């Protein structure tokens, strides 16, 4: 396993079906496409590779719509893999994780696993401290998406979710479009249609370590979040419904600082509740894709990740509850 650790972010990538050859051709990140070929619930899994003119490479598997690797140049021009991922489909199947996944139907937590639609209360799986997390234990991150490689930089994944899937109402057809641009941006677009009133909240769940060295903690990374407010959580990581200013708290990243600077401030209740950072920030961008929502930089590699989104919030998770299995 590649042990690249830190923070959930959102980005985009590029593609070429790289596992339909008789001979084994490794990806730039050293992945063997053959190790991603299997059948899950009668559906075929594959590894797809996107590559742009600048030499950036992104590998994606249609199992869970997962980003497996992102290869980008560091300040010296050396290519580095900056996300956490496994080296085979067997590990993704046998070791429960959300690494790089396209989460659905509903990312993050639903309080006590209950939704109310047209006055009717619907009970969903309670798979995390009594709440429904990431669509339940059989969320889309554990299902096989159908794949449509559009060109060498674009991959479209589709998931058809039947009515009653994890007790969510409505037949849903969801699409995730990955586009790798020549300026080393990964554009991810989500869309979904349904025949009933329901709830949908999709995201990408990649973990970044921009140093390119999995033996180094990513807490030395410098983080900026374009947000004056955040939503606090209780001891079960459920949002309380409040919106609170970040000013003069460890939650303030309006001035860039290292993730490590306040991550051990257990005298601050929110750091204690989240065992670090596992919170949503209310973005100042208000859906403006021309404004950066967050920025993360490794002082070692010089690699910078910028996040742009039309959503109202961004979740930052420092992965302090995950214990990496042996490779």
State each model region's role:
Residues 37-80, 86, 112-122:
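Beta-strand-rich N-terminal accessory domains
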Residues 322-327:
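Conserved small/polar residues in nucleotide/adenosyl-binding loops
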Residues 5-13:
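Sec-dependent N-terminal signal peptides
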Residues 78-140, 222-223, 238-245, 250-253:
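Active-site loop/turn microenvironments that scaffold catalytic and metal-binding pockets
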Residues 26-30, 34-44, 51, 121, ...:
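Extended, loop-rich substrate-binding clefts of extracytoplasmic carbohydrate-active enzymes
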Residues 16-17:
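C-terminal motif of bacterial Sec signal peptides marking the signal peptidase cleavage site
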Residues 51-52, 56-62, 160-215:
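Acidic, contiguous internal or C-terminal segments within carbohydrate-active enzymes
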Residues 214-299:
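Active-site/ligand-binding surface loops and adjacent short beta/alpha elements
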């Amino acid at each position: 396993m590649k042990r690249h650790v830190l923070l959930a972010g959102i980005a985009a990538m590029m593609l070429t079906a790289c596992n339909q050859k008789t001979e084994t051709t490794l990806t730039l990140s050293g992945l063997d496409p053959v190790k991603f070929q299997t059948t899950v619930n009668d559906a075929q899994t594959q590894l797809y590779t996107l590559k742009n003119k600048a030499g950036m490479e992104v590998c994606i598997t249609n199992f869970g719509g997962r980003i497996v690797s992102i290869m980008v140049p560091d300040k010296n021009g050396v290519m580095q893999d900056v996300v956490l991922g496994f080296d085979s489909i067997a590990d993704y199947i046998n070791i429960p994780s959300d690494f790089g996944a396209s989460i659905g139907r509903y990312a993050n937590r639903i309080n006590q696993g209950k939704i109310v639609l047209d006055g009717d209360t619907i009970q969903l799986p309670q798979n995390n401290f009594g709440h429904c997390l990431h669509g339940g234990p059989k969320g889309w991150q554990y299902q096989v998406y159908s794949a449509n490689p559009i060109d060498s930089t674009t991959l479209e994944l589709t998931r058809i979710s039947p009515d009653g899937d994890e007790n969510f109402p409505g037949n849903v057809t969801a699409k995730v479009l990955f586009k790798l641009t020549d300026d080393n941006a990964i554009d991810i677009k989500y869309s979904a249609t349904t025949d009933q009133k329901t709830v949908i909240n999709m995201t990408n769940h990649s973990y970044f370590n921009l140093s390119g060295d999995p033996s180094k903690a990513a807490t030395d990374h410098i983080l900026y979040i374009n947000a004056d407010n955040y939503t606090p959580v209780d001891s079960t990581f459920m949002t309380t419904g409040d919106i609170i200013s970040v000013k003069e708290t460890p939650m303030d990243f309006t001035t860039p600082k290292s993730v490590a600077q306040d991550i051990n401030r257990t005298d601050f209740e929110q750091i204690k509740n989240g065992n670090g950072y596992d919170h949503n920030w209310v973005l100042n961008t208000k859906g403006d894709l021309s404004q950066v929502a967050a920025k993360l930089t490794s002082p070692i590699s010089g690699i910078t990740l910028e996040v742009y989104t039309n959503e109202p919030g961004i979740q930052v998770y420092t992965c302090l509850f995950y214990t990496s299995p042996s490779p």
